[in-house]
Amino acid sequence: MEKRSFKEKLEIIRNIIRESLLGNAAIIALIYAASHSLPVNAFPDYLVISLLSIAAGIVVLWLFSIIYIYFCELFRSHWIAVWFIIWSSVINLIILYGFYDRFI
């Protein structure tokens, strides 16, 4: 098992930042699109909200998979990547719970 150079580690971190910025921008665009359908008044609004929710879920899964792949490459351990995904999921749920009252 070879050790990675500092430059290679920085390139992996750069890739993580680049890919996660794209995913975060997609989530922001989906939230902005969903904000135009709130409050829900008719059936098409329910359809739009449900489709945007599914798209947001797919983007979040894509982000977790990208982070998992790069963390496994960076640390050479699957457990660190799994613990990071669990930790970030808990943080996201706490943030979502904090903003829940503002959206409803």
Swiss-Prot record:
Keywords: Plasmid
Protein name, UniProt field: Protein ArtA
Lineage: Bacteria, Pseudomonadati, Pseudomonadota, Gammaproteobacteria, Enterobacterales
Gene: artA
